[in-house]
C-alpha cells in the first residue's frame, strides 16, 4: 500500500495498480509539502519522495475610505474626498478604467502595500464611471464607482434684449430675458424699481413691468444652486 500526507484540504489521492494519483480542488491557500510513504516489509525511500503544492489565494478589493466616497457628486473645480481601496488576498496590484474618460484633474495613485487612491480636483463636468480591476494569478474581482461633476451656474442675456433700458416713468420697459445654465434650482432678482418684477420658468428669467418711480436701479440676478454663481453676478 502507500499513503500520502500533507495535502491541502480538498485534495486527495488514490492508490491502485501500483500507481498513486493525487487530485482534487484545494479549498485553502498556502504552501503544502506532501510526502508519499510506501507501506511494505522493506525500507522506504530516504529521503522520502514527495513534492509541494502551492495554492494561490483569490484577490480581494475593499473600499477603505468612508462609506459612500466611491460615489460622489461634486461641483466643478472642487476637491473630491479621497477614494481609497485595499487589494488583498492573492492580489498583486490594480488598474483603473474610466467611462467615458478620466475626468481632467483626477488621478489614480498607488500608495504602497497594495493601497490605491483616487483623488484630485475635477476641472470638467459630467458623469464619470470607473472600474478598478485587480491583478493576480487567480480570481480577480473588480470595484466600481462614479464621480458626478456638476457645472457652476451661468447667466446669459438673451440675444437682442437690452439689459439696461431707459424708459419714462409709468411706461412699460421692454422685457429683459436671461437664460440660466449649469447647475441651479432657482433664481432671484434684486434691485428692481417699484412696478417692475420678474418671473422664473424653464431656466429663463424674464424682467418686465412699468416703473412707477424714477431713478437708476442696478439689479442683480442671483442663481440658487449647489455650485458657484457667476462673479460678478
Where are these regions (language model features)?
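Extracellular acidic loop/turn motifs
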Residues: 1-2, 88-95, 180-188
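Low-complexity "stalk/linker" and mucin-like segments enriched in Ser/Thr/Pro/Ala/Gly
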Residues: 3-19, 95-116, 188-205
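A short beta-strand micro-motif common to beta-rich folds, especially ectodomain repeats
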Residues: 30-42, 85, 126-137, 215-227
Amino acid at each position: 500500500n502507500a499513503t500520502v500526507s500533507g495535502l491541502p484540504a480538498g485534495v486527495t489521492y488514490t492508490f491502485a495498480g501500483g500507481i498513486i494519483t493525487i487530485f482534487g480542488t484545494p479549498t485553502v491557500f498556502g504552501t503544502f509539502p506532501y510526502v508519499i510513504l510506501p507501506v511494505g516489509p522493506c525500507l522506504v525511500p530516504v529521503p522520502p519522495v514527495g513534492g509541494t503544492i502551492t495554492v494561490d489565494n483569490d484577490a480581494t478589493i475593499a473600499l477603505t475610505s468612508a462609506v459612500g466616497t466611491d460615489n460622489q457628486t461634486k461641483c466643478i473645480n472642487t476637491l473630491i474626498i479621497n477614494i481609497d481601496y485595499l487589494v488583498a488576498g492573492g492580489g498583486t496590484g490594480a488598474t483603473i478604467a474610466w467611462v467615458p474618460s478620466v475626468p481632467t484633474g483626477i488621478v489614480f495613485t498607488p500608495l504602497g502595500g497594495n493601497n490605491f487612491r483616487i483623488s484630485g480636483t475635477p476641472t470638467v463636468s459630467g458623469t464619470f464611471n470607473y472600474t478598478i480591476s485587480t491583478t493576480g494569478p487567480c480570481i480577480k474581482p473588480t470595484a466600481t464607482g462614479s464621480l458626478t461633476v456638476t457645472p457652476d451656474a451661468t447667466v446669459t442675456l438673451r440675444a437682442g434684449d437690452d439689459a439696461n433700458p431707459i424708459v419714462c416713468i409709468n411706461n412699460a420697459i421692454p422685457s429683459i430675458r436671461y437664460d440660466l445654465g449649469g447647475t441651479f434650482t432657482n433664481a432671484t432678482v434684486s434691485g428692481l424699481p417699484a412696478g417692475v418684477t420678474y418671473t422664473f420658468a424653464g431656466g429663463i428669467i424674464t424682467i418686465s413691468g412699468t416703473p412707477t418711480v424714477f431713478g437708476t436701479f442696478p439689479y442683480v440676478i442671483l442663481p440658487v444652486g449647489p455650485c458657484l454663481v457667476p462673479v460678478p453676478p
